[in-house]
C-alpha cells in the first residue's frame, strides 16, 4: 500500500512577532535563528518592560451575516493588532481601536449574566456606575444589582416579548454589552444580542474577564487622552 500522506507543517507561531515588537529583545534576532543560545548572547534573565503590550485578534464576523460571534476552539481571526501604553487600560483601549472597535466613554451598558457569575460582575457594574454609565439589565441580573445598591433599569429578554434588549440596541439606547449565559433560551437570546451588537458596532463581552478588561479600557479613556509613541520610543 502507498505510504500515508505527510501532514502539512504547523502554522508559524503568531506570538513571536508580537513578543518581538513589544519586548525589543535580542532573543528573536538573527543570532538565535542562526543557532546561538540565549546564554551565549548574555540573556539569562526575563525581560520585563516598563510598559504593557496587549495583542488583539481581528475577527471578520461582519463579512459573515449568519455566523455567531461567540468564540470557540477553532481559529477565526484574520490578523492581529497590538496596543502599547504605560498602563493596562490605555494599552487595551489602543488594541481595541487598532482592531476597529472604539470604546464608548458615556451612555448605557447592558448587563445580563448567569447566576454563578453575578457576584463576579458586581465590581464591573459598580465601576461603570461610578464613571456615570447608566445600566440596563434583564430581570435576574437587575434584581441582583438592585439588591447590592447599583441603580439599573430592567429590560425584557428577547424570548419574553417586545420591546426587548435587541430593540434597545437598534434604537441606539445601549453603547456597551456584557452578556453571558447558559441553557438553550439564553443561547438563542445571546445569539440575537451578539448579532445586533455586531451590526451596530457595539462593543460586547461574553466573559467576566473580558468585561473587566473593557471596563479598565473605558476608564482609561475617560481619565485622560491616549498618548502616541513609536515602538522605538518605548524601546529606548
Predicted features, each with a name:
Residues 22-154, 158-183, 187-203, 211-214, ...:
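ATP-dependent carboxylate/acyl-activation modules
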Residues 207:
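Extended, alpha-helix-rich binding/interface surfaces that flank or overlap catalytic cores
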Amino acid at each position: 500500500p502507498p505510504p500515508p500522506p505527510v501532514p502539512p507543517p504547523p502554522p508559524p507561531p503568531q506570538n513571536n512577532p508580537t513578543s518581538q515588537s513589544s519586548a525589543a529583545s535580542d532573543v528573536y534576532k538573527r543570532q538565535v535563528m542562526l543557532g546561538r543560545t540565549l546564554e551565549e548572547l548574555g540573556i539569562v534573565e526575563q525581560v520585563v518592560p516598563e510598559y504593557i503590550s496587549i495583542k488583539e485578534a481581528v475577527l471578520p464576523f461582519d463579512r459573515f451575516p449568519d455566523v455567531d460571534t461567540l468564540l470557540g476552539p477553532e481559529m477565526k481571526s484574520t490578523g492581529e493588532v497590538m496596543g502599547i501604553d504605560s498602563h493596562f487600560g490605555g494599552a487595551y483601549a489602543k488594541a481595541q481601536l487598532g482592531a476597529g472597535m472604539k470604546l464608548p466613554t458615556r451612555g448605557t451598558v447592558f448587563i445580563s449574566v448567569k447566576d454563578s457569575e453575578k457576584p463576579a460582575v458586581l465590581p464591573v457594574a459598580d465601576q461603570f456606575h461610578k464613571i456615570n454609565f447608566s445600566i440596563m439589565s434583564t430581570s435576574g441580573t437587575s434584581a441582583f444589582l438592585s439588591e447590592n445598591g447599583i441603580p439599573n433599569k430592567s429590560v425584557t429578554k428577547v424570548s419574553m416579548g417586545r420591546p426587548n434588549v435587541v430593540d434597545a440596541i437598534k434604537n441606539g439606547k445601549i453603547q456597551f454589552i456584557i452578556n453571558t449565559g447558559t441553557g438553550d433560551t439564553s443561547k438563542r437570546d445571546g445569539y440575537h444580542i451578539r448579532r445586533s451588537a455586531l451590526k451596530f458596532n457595539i462593543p460586547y463581552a461574553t466573559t467576566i474577564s473580558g468585561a473587566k478588561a473593557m471596563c479598565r479600557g473605558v476608564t482609561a479613556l475617560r481619565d485622560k487622552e491616549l498618548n502616541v509613541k513609536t515602538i522605538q520610543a518605548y524601546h529606548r
